[in-house]
């Protein structure tokens, strides 16, 4: 299910009715994919990495925190890494390509 905003109250209801994966888990709405993984270990999680960590004004450590988060979820399985929504125009192309390259290394793609 693609659901914008905060979905923590919807997930258990939707799972009871057969939904087994969600995206994009918006960080700005308070969604924390590591918390969702802890609460719902069988839920497929897609996205959930903070797109603003890639913004031109964001420090490099912000992107590395998101990559570390992706690595932790990938270890568990049931996770497709990606950003928490469309990539905004303040994300430089070079930074985006670097981020994607590092995600590829994490996933073995």
Where are these regions (language model features)?
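Active-site loop segments of alpha/beta catalytic cores
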Residues: 1-109
């Amino acid at each position: 299910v693609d659901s914008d905003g905060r979905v923590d109250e919807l997930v258990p209801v939707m799972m009871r009715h057969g939904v087994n994966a969600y995206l994009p888990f918006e960080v700005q709405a308070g969604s924390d994919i590591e918390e969702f993984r802890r609460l719902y270990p069988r839920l497929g999680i897609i996205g959930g990495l903070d797109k603003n960590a890639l913004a031109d004004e964001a420090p490099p450590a912000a992107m590395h925190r998101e990559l570390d988060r992706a690595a932790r979820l990938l270890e568990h399985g049931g996770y497709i890494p990606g950003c928490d929504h469309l990539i905004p125009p303040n994300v430089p192309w070079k930074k985006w390509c670097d981020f994607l390259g590092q995600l590829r290394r994490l996933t073995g793609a």
